[in-house]
Amino acid sequence: AAWMPARENRATTDVVTPPDGLLISLADAKGHLQLDSDFTGDDGRITALIRTAADYIENEAGIAIQAQVLAARFDRFSPVLRLVRGPVSVVNSVKYFDQNGALQTVPAEQCRVSRRRNVALIEMLPGHTWPDTQRAMDAVAVEYQAGYSDAGLYPSQALHAARILVRHWYDHPDLQVTGTIATTLSHTVDALINQIRDRSEG
């Protein structure tokens, strides 16, 4: 059967370049764990827990907190392309596979990017239209820079949730492997993540 695109042109988002730093510092996490700053035996493990917590929070909240490069992939062009995992600072490129399967780039000067909270919208300027694409999954790819420009802008709820998750997984290493959290703790973390989500959607 011929390939048919989904009715709703939603993006799948992948990380191209992950964040350089940590959502909370190693010293911050060790302080919350009540570990002596001179004790370094678990530094590698704690750092990994911080990264896991950051991934969990960003995925659940549907936003990018730390600065990173993302790629949103669509099955086709639609009048407006929605980049839902923001905040978006810069759109690097809009690329697509043409009807012959060759990779092409939409000229940046033909597009307009507008931002609403953590969502960025891309549309063609008057006088221009989106080109035809190959009928295939992920025919369109938008690469963009996302995340807060300064650590001082990180949502406080995200920092608090990260500390809670790091403590929980540090105390229960068997749960770290699956990235799961206890039900009672889940309510607290979910409440914090919901606040981030509500703030993002405004």
Region annotations inferred by a language model:
Residues A1-G202:
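Divalent metal-cofactor coordination and adjacent catalytic microenvironments
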